[in-house]
Swiss-Prot record:
HAMAP family given in the database record: UPF0246 (MF_00652)
Upper lineage: Bacteria, Bacillati, Bacillota, Bacilli, Lactobacillales
Cellular component aspect of the GO annotation: cytosol
Family that this chain belongs to: Belongs to the UPF0246 family.
The protein's name: UPF0246 protein SGO_1307
InterPro entries the record matches: YaaA
Gene Ontology BP annotations: response to hydroperoxide
Pfam family, one: H2O2_YaaD
Length: 244
């Protein structure tokens, strides 16, 4: 069983650094392509302010020169979902679970173990960057598929932006999750609920070393409970009742 989570724009470089690992050929190609961009080019590419573009330019040059500092991906990313994942004071068993089951889908590094070393960067699949005349999604599709080809159980906590990178035969195997709040008999779903709940759900999986779909259906965490009547074979729905 593998669990797939996306990257995040928010980063925390106040965490402990770790030694870098050798980069894949695709990652090197992307870095080489980005290294040709000026600060002004990057501001346009990412639709960001000049000062942010300058920061990104410096990051890219460090990646190109192999002087970039690297951090465990799970700790470097610090978006809302990540802030709701249990990341501190993991037991040996919990850390082993993370190493065995959790994968992060990156537009720069590919599908990587959650604790793999990565450098700070801004790139995502919405970036209109061409590498060898291919979009980032096209560039990575085959590699993404190979990364999880042998997995029978594939849990996706990804947005469509990341799921679409995988080949159809892999997407068809994915178990997806919907997290909803119910208030006064009405159920709703929105981005903030989903991002927080994904992190809380992942924490539950880590703490309880969950590896079976039957155990996921018994899950209860942070007020969310599995709803058999709302779920489908490959879409599991969890609902949290909140006071009116």
């Amino acid at each position: 069983m593998k669990i797939l989570i996306p990257t995040a724009k928010e980063l925390n470089t106040q965490v402990a650094q770790i030694e870098p690992e050798s980069l894949s050929e695709k990652t090197k190609l992307i870095i080489r392509a980005l290294s040709q961009y000026s600060v002004a080019d990057l501001a346009q590419l990412y639709q960001i302010r000049p000062e942010k573009a300058k920061e990104e330019y410096q990051r890219i040059q460090k990646l190109q020169n192999e002087t970039a500092l690297t951090y465990p991906a799970l700790y470097l990313f610090d978006g809302l979902m990540y802030r709701n994942i249990k990341r501190k004071n993991l037991t040996k068993e919990e850390e082993q679970y993370v190493q065995n089951h959790l994968l992060i889908t990156s537009s720069l590094y590919g599908v990587i173990p959650a604790l793999a070393p990565i450098a700070p960067h801004r790139l995502d699949f919405m970036t209109k960057l061409k590498v060898e005349k291919q979009s980032l999604k096209k560039l990575w599709t085959e590699t993404y598929g190979q990364a999880v080809a042998d997995q029978e159980i594939l849990l996706s906590l990804l947005s469509s932006e990341f799921e679409e990178v995988f080949p159809k035969e892999v997407r068809d195997k994915m178990i997806r999750f919907k997290f909803m709040e119910e208030k006064d008999g009405k159920r709703k779903i929105h981005s903030t609920i989903s991002k927080k709940a994904r992190g809380q759900f992942l924490s539950y999986l880590i703490e309880n070393h969950i590896t079976k779909l039957s155990d996921i259906k018994q899950s209860s965490f942070s007020g969310f409970k599995f709803q058999e009547n709302l779920s489908q074979e490959r879409e599991f729905v969890f609902v949290k009742k909140v006071d009116g």
